[in-house]
Design a protein with these regions (language model features):
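N-terminal ligand-binding lobe of clamshell/alpha-beta domains
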Residues: 1-167
Length: 167
């Protein structure tokens, strides 16, 4: 293991156990939630890319009590179009463009797309810009992103959940 190679095996085991316990606790809460909202993750605006079934954001969405809007597509990354998003009508829209700084993402541009105002997410004011470093990079910080997402989707159910202490 990496912990053994760096001569910090005991510390690495504590971190791993805490990480896995966080996932287990979040998964348990998610299983108790009856109504799971759909989440559209926009990774890139033109052409539109979003994560599919075999992407970590499907699991992150699930442990946060949501459903990845494109979990039915057997790909890691799905190129789609705006008409498909309109048909699927997500409950939440999370904009996290790969390689683009948080402050440079412009939700106003999404709102100008045809029929955007008809989407559940827009009508319920559930369009959010999310941190790329918490959602678009496979790392231990994904659990931090999962906690943030869970508190947005189900604030009451996840109110006592915090990211692992090592983050």
């Amino acid at each position: 293991t990496l912990g053994r190679a760096c001569d910090v095996e005991d510390r690495a085991k504590v971190i791993m156990d805490e990480y896995l316990q966080s996932i287990k606790e979040m998964r348990s809460i998610a299983q108790s939630i009856a109504k799971k909202p759909s989440v559209y993750w926009e990774w890139w605006p033109n052409p539109i890319f979003t994560p599919g079934k075999i992407n970590w954001l499907t699991e992150i969405s699930a442990i946060a009590g949501g459903i990845n809007l494109f979990q039915d597509v057997e790909l890691a990354s799905v190129q789609t179009n705006w008409d498909d998003i309109i048909k699927r009508n997500p409950d939440y829209i999370m904009m996290s463009w790969v390689g683009v700084a948080f402050e440079r993402i412009q939700p106003a541009n999404l709102l100008k797309r045809p029929h955007a105002q008809e989407l559940n997410a827009i009508q319920m004011e559930r369009l959010h810009v999310m941190e790329e470093w918490l959602y678009c990079r496979p790392s231990p910080r994904l659990i931090e992103g999962a906690v943030k997402l869970a508190k947005m989707l189900h604030p009451q159910e996840y109110k006592h959940i915090e990211p692992p202490s090592f983050l």
